[in-house]
Amino acid sequence: MNKIELLGRLTKDVEMKQTKTGKKVATFTIAVAKNKENAIFINILAFDKLGEIAEKYLKKGRQVVIVGSLNIRDYEDKEGKKHYVTEVLAENIYFVGNSKQDEKEELPF
């Protein structure tokens, strides 16, 4: 089983990209507290409708719970050096706490 749940805050606004096959994907990073003084930064990918919702409602600083699966992929750079990327493929996104913006808008998740 490959399931992960993370609680963290967005480090910047969501960015929409397109895969080589033309699929839309929202990308963002959350900071997850390791302890009081340290955090780890996790890259998140949200595809299709979930990605569109993320782009519309998630902003820098927003606290969220991400439920998804861990993904590790590799690629070669221009010099032929292999790199590994660890990221989470989001299946669900939940808001934590309240913000004034949340009170004004009805959220679809």
Show which residues each predicted segment covers.
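Acidic, gly/ser/pro-rich intrinsically disordered tails
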Residues: 1, 14-21, 37, 41, ...
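OB-fold and OB-like beta-barrel modules that bind single-stranded nucleic acids
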Residues: 4-12, 30, 60-71, 90-93
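Short aromatic-glycine-enriched beta-strand elements
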Residues: 18-32, 84
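Short acidic, glycine-rich loop/turn motifs
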Residues: 32-36, 77
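Beta-rich strand-turn-strand
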Residues: 47-83
